[in-house]
Amino acid sequence: MLRGTYLFGYAFFFTVGIIHISTGSLTPFLLEAFNKTTDDISVIIFFQFTGFLSGVLIAPLMIKKYSHFRTLTLALTIMLVALSIFFLTKDWYYIIVMAFLLGYGAGTLETTVGSFVIANFESNAEKMSKLEVLFGLGALSFPLLINSFIDINNWFLPYYCIFTFLFVLFVGWLIFLSKNREYAKNANQQVTFPDGGAFQYFIGDRKKSKQLGFFVFFAFLYAGIETNFANFLPSIMINQDNEQISLISVSFFWVGIIIGRILIGFVSRRLDFSKYLLFSCSCLIVLLIAFSYISNPILQLSGTFLIGLSIAGIFPIALTLASIIIQKYVDEVTSLFIASASFGGAIISFLIGWSLNQDTILLTMGIFTTMAVILVGISVKIRRTKTEDPISLENKASKTQ
């Protein structure tokens, strides 16, 4: 049952990757079909990530009350219902509602699968890294599908494809649960919930609360860069008069992330995590500045790939480092880290959407670069952080692998 659920986790994370990039990949078609601006696209992205944040925050409560299995079933059901209604209406405002519901389902799937892996597998870091690769493959495959088969006359077909995939996955999941009915019925895996002890711990320890604040802000800014760069990349390319590569550029970005995460999985045991964050964020600054002044399509695609490669390991490494440095209440720290990332993706989308309407790509890239500079500053602060435990961060990290 455990192994089977984990294998379904691959499909669930693949789905999350698709939902994560769906709006951004369809941006050129949505702009033309509904005669909208990038500000309007920002609204969809905001509601999508608000839904994702809601799923991240509510999923632990659902798991506690109904178990991991029922929570996953509910998430799939909500997503299928949302997509079913889309068959009946292509209204702009319903697309916003659907984005929220799909985001909620994706947030619930990611949080629930992650909680299940952490609760049931000793090698949870390795298991999670494999799931993250499937997330990247999902985010990669969707823009490839759109670039190959979709035009302005059938822009809605990708949502039909998502529905078909989810329906097959849902049926397979129900069959799997029916064959393991007793185990699923008696399952009582629960996550650890924040309590007064966690609150008092951070309030009473100024150093720990400061460290937590650094990591939460880091997650906010990082997700603001990654998610919005990916979602607005087609619009960025169009603004630079490279519409012919606007869709395929998203795939180059996610190929870079996938390769980067695979490489990080191989070398993570030997990494100095704080040095890695500082190095990656510094590389990101250089690449973003260079990207701002590149107009050649080949060089732009290469730059997009390198940006994806440079940031591939930042999120999982920062999350792992946060749990190592702060030491206690790891579940609470993890939930807060992911929630802050979701919030960053939602809020910063408005800023990026506004900047793209100013008809100068330098403003948009300047915003991304400024956030990357702040990430470097936070990385320096993290680098200087010393734990009370004499065991080195690197030795502790090796024990978490």
Curated annotation (Swiss-Prot):
<feature type="transmembrane region" description="Helical">
    <location>
        <begin position="360"/>
        <end position="380"/>
    </location>
</feature>
<feature type="transmembrane region" description="Helical">
    <location>
        <begin position="278"/>
        <end position="298"/>
    </location>
</feature>
<dbReference type="InterPro" id="IPR020846">
    <property type="entry name" value="MFS_dom"/>
</dbReference>
<feature type="transmembrane region" description="Helical">
    <location>
        <begin position="156"/>
        <end position="176"/>
    </location>
</feature>
<feature type="transmembrane region" description="Helical">
    <location>
        <begin position="78"/>
        <end position="98"/>
    </location>
</feature>
<keyword id="KW-0472">Membrane</keyword>
<dbReference type="GO" id="GO:0022857">
    <property type="term" value="F:transmembrane transporter activity"/>
</dbReference>
<feature type="transmembrane region" description="Helical">
    <location>
        <begin position="247"/>
        <end position="267"/>
    </location>
</feature>
<keyword id="KW-0813">Transport</keyword>
<dbReference type="InterPro" id="IPR036259">
    <property type="entry name" value="MFS_trans_sf"/>
</dbReference>
<feature type="transmembrane region" description="Helical">
    <location>
        <begin position="99"/>
        <end position="119"/>
    </location>
</feature>
<keyword id="KW-0812">Transmembrane</keyword>
<dbReference type="GO" id="GO:0005886">
    <property type="term" value="C:plasma membrane"/>
</dbReference>
<feature type="transmembrane region" description="Helical">
    <location>
        <begin position="212"/>
        <end position="232"/>
    </location>
</feature>
<comment type="similarity">
    <text>Belongs to the major facilitator superfamily.</text>
</comment>
<comment type="function">
    <text>Can transport glucose, mannose, 2-deoxyglucose and methyl alpha-glucoside, but not galactose.</text>
</comment>
<feature type="transmembrane region" description="Helical">
    <location>
        <begin position="11"/>
        <end position="31"/>
    </location>
</feature>
<dbReference type="InterPro" id="IPR011701">
    <property type="entry name" value="MFS"/>
</dbReference>
<keyword id="KW-0762">Sugar transport</keyword>
<dbReference type="Pfam" id="PF07690">
    <property type="entry name" value="MFS_1"/>
</dbReference>
<feature type="transmembrane region" description="Helical">
    <location>
        <begin position="306"/>
        <end position="326"/>
    </location>
</feature>
<protein>
    <recommendedName>
        <fullName>Glucose/mannose transporter GlcP</fullName>
    </recommendedName>
</protein>
<keyword id="KW-1003">Cell membrane</keyword>
<feature type="transmembrane region" description="Helical">
    <location>
        <begin position="43"/>
        <end position="63"/>
    </location>
</feature>
<feature type="transmembrane region" description="Helical">
    <location>
        <begin position="336"/>
        <end position="356"/>
    </location>
</feature>
<feature type="transmembrane region" description="Helical">
    <location>
        <begin position="132"/>
        <end position="152"/>
    </location>
</feature>
<dbReference type="InterPro" id="IPR051788">
    <property type="entry name" value="MFS_Transporter"/>
</dbReference>
<dbReference type="GO" id="GO:0016020">
    <property type="term" value="C:membrane"/>
</dbReference>
<keyword id="KW-1133">Transmembrane helix</keyword>
